Amino acid sequence: MMTNLNIKLHHGLVNSTPKQRAAAQTLGLNKIGKTVTREDTPALRGQLQVLRHLITVEEAD
C-alpha cells in the first residue's frame, strides 16, 4: 500500500512560472493555506519537485 502525503501551499503563485502554476492547479492548490492529500507516486514527486519552494509536505497518518 502506498503512503499518502499532505501537501500545503504556503506561498502564493503570483511570480511563479507557467510550469509551477500548472503543477499547482493539477494538485488542486489554488489558495495560500490550502491542504490536499494525495497518494505518493513518482509522478506526484515530480510535481512536488517543481513546487518545492512554495509548499510543505508531510506524511499523512
Curated annotation (Swiss-Prot):
> How is the subunit organization of this protein annotated in UniProt?
Part of the 50S ribosomal subunit.
Q: What is this protein called?
A: Large ribosomal subunit protein uL30
Q: Please give the Gene Ontology molecular function terms for this protein.
A: structural constituent of ribosome
Under the heading HAMAP family, the entry gives: Ribosomal_uL30_B
Task: Give UniProt keywords alphabetically.
Answer: Ribonucleoprotein, Ribosomal protein
Q: Name one GO biological process term.
A: translation
Q: Which cysteine-cysteine pairs are annotated as disulfide bonds in the entry? A: none
Sorted alphabetically, the Gene Ontology cellular component annotations on this record are: large ribosomal subunit
Keyword Transferase annotated: no
Q: Which Pfam families match?
A: Ribosomal_L30
- Asked if the Swiss-Prot or TrEMBL record annotates the protein with the keyword Plastid, the reply is no
Q: Superkingdom of this entry's organism?
A: Bacteria
Show the SUPFAM superfamilies listed in the entry.
Ribosomal protein L30p/L7e (SSF55129)
Q: Which family does it belong to?
A: Belongs to the universal ribosomal protein uL30 family.
